[in-house]
Amino acid sequence: MTSPCSARLQLDENLQLMQAGSPMRKVKSRSWKKQRYFKLQEDCMTIWYNSKKTGNTKSTFSISDIETVREGHQSEVLQSIAEEFKPELCFTIVFHGRRANLDLVANTPEEAQCWIQGLEKLIETVTNMDRKDLMDQWICDWFQKADKNKDGRMNFKEVQDLLKMMNVDMSEHHAFRLFQMADKSESGTLEGEEFVLFYKALTQRDEVLKIFQDFSKDGKKLTLLEFVDFLQQGQLEEENTEEIAMDLIARYEPSDTAKKLHAMSIDGFLVYLCSPEGSIFNVAHEQLYQDMMQPLCHYFISSSHNTYLMEDQIRGQSSIEGYIRALKRGCRCVEVDTWDGPNGEPIVYHGRTFTSKILFKDVISAIDKYAFRVSDYPVILSLENHCGVEQQDAMAQHLKSILGNKLVMSTLDGRIPVRLPSPDELRGKILLKGKKIGRLEDSLEEQPDDSLGEVSDEEENIEVEEERNEDKKRAKKSKERLSQELSDCVIYCKSVPFVSFQHSRAHYILYEMSSVTEYKARKLVREPGNDFVRHNAWQLMRIYPTGLRTDSSNYNPQDMWNVGCQMTALNFQTAGVEMDLNDGLFRQNARCGYVLKPSFMRHVETTFNPDQPQGTEGYSPVNLSILVISAQQLPKVENSKEGSIVDPLVRVEIFGVPIDQTKQETKYIENNGFNPMWYETLHFKIHVPELALVRFVVEDYDKTSRNDFVGQYTLPFKSIKSGYRHIHLLSRDGTKIPPASLFVHIRVTDASQPEQDT
């Protein structure tokens, strides 16, 4: 059976050479370099490689698993063998998610180029596949897996094995009936189009057909008016529904005849429901839709802790790959932990542990290269400086020489700021967060203008003078430990110790900011009143995990977002609920790494209190009703027994202010991970919707132990689209797992209005 990918690319010379196979060295370290035989499968979608010595298949991976290919010595592993192998022989395969990169050395430059160009073409082809191509590819993939003897046809025994692989528990009688219906040639086997018929019969969506027929008079098509009715009544769209209907028909209806009639067939209807426009995530929020001209302190900023670590904090690997991955995920604040290194070169690692070490200048070079690949909004380097003055000077030189004019070395207008600059004003810029000698005013010739206001009261003058004297004492003390050159690189993010909210109001300036541990932040969250929220309306604050988290685990970031903390730093290398929430929040606004805080968190006189939101700004309760209808083609649980089939349940979790934290789940469906049906409605009341995140989780029920994770999807409540929606599930590490999805109906009503049944 020919895959759409191989059919499209079968004449490509590079791919033909890749299908013939090539011996290459797989490299893990300077001392671990082993010969492997790599080959592109006939489907043009799978690479397998084996040991040249034994001939046993060692591993396979899909082209869809690959994010990009890097040419030359672009990984630390390949840099370590640069003297042994020329760059034109080397390349790195980078995978989606947290999977380790694959570093390879070809035997000739021509062979390396063949694989680099071939892989790039395959990645581009897969990326540009439409839904029909993807469906054809999935069908082909299943056929390849089930056709054990590789004779190009499938007998009934192979079909039965396939059903188990697909998480389908079906009676032998029903399976044989579907098999016979598809076996048009009556040969006792399925091949080519016969298998396509079988797959389509297997994947028929009865629940979608029912919705279609509810709105279709003849049961065969939706006229334009019928489709408009569906958009208004089913999808709860209120504006421009006729224009939307025309656009959706033009884009998703496969039949030219139906298009000319401005009608939609059941095939087009299903394609639309599975498209981005049929997704639960509002496509308008995939664009840059927020005001980016507010001061930095008015945004939640995607922030990473111990960015250089790939694993735990005791023996884990330090790598520039940590920075590359974080920045490519939209992270805008990365941590650089510096220590004195040999040969006068500062190094980055988790100090006083067995983690490996990397050069500071290599980290800055990686940041320079990748800072603005996915977002052109500012990157903040959070500097944890343990170096002596001499190597601090070296750090300053590297920052200036490598980053050039990207590094902010003065206020934007050369004047003392009266507010923090906006993300828009700082496009393409890199800010250094760290300690600074004295005040910013000392390094600027321009003095404050009248807009800052004059201090006329005699008592205030005395207080200011005393404060200046204290500043001079502190500056003199810090000069002994801090390089002037490095200090001059700190402009808008001067690090100062946090004492109390009252102390910050009395002594600190808007360009000064504090970093506190999650433990201290939680204590501040528990303080009565809303001082924390007000503080974060005018000054930046960074929260980071406690040092006790040696396994690089994370804390719940929602608690910090509830009080407006901008930089809630997490260990990006560690998958889990906490990173799901982070990915969910920053999924919106073009994934640019900046999300505008709600208006009630952006002014210092706000009354909003997350612990007691009733009667304050931000309190606008709504009812959320979720009808969980079905799931489609759920993946097998990791490390599950052969032949086992999942018993799926769906849990919906609400994260937000304390009163909104809750979860509900459906019953489990026994032995059906392929097309389970629930038709269960879950009801929630959300009091502060602008801070709420909704997480959909699918688990494999286990009555004797903990349920196993199957997939999840997290998004801001305000980004949810009402109506019939698909939720395209993600794996534990946040990568896509097509075609796995949930199908739901969403209804949101004002909490003062009675809910309607779906």
Curated annotation (Swiss-Prot):
Binding residue positions for Ca(2+) 1: 147, 149, 151, 153, 158
Binding site for Ca(2+) 4: 645, 647, 671
Residues spanned by motif GBA: 213-243
SUPFAM superfamilies to which the protein is assigned, alphabetical: C2 domain (Calcium/lipid-binding domain, CaLB), EF-hand, PH domain-like, PLC-like phosphodiesterases
Binding site for Ca(2+) 3: 306, 335, 337, 384
One of the record's GO molecular function terms: calcium ion binding
Domain PI-PLC X-box: 290-435
All copies of domain EF-hand, residue ranges: 134-169, 170-205, 206-237
Residues the entry annotates as binding Ca(2+) 5: 700-702
EC number(s) given by UniProt: 3.1.4.11
Gene this chain is encoded by: plcd4
Region Disordered: start-end pairs: 446-479
Chief location category: membrane
Active site per UniProt: 305, 350
Protein name per Swiss-Prot or TrEMBL: 1-phosphatidylinositol 4,5-bisphosphate phosphodiesterase delta-4
Compositionally biased residues, Acidic residues: 446-468
Cofactor(s) needed for function: Ca(2+)
Catalytic activity: a 1,2-diacyl-sn-glycero-3-phospho-(1D-myo-inositol-4,5-bisphosphate) + H2O = 1D-myo-inositol 1,4,5-trisphosphate + a 1,2-diacyl-sn-glycerol + H(+); a 1,2-diacyl-sn-glycero-3-phospho-(1D-myo-inositol) + H2O = 1D-myo-inositol 1-phosphate + a 1,2-diacyl-sn-glycerol + H(+)
Membrane topology, record value: Peripheral membrane protein
Region (Substrate binding) location: 26-53
GO biological process: intracellular signal transduction; lipid catabolic process
Residues the record lists as binding Ca(2+) 2: 183, 185, 187, 189, 194
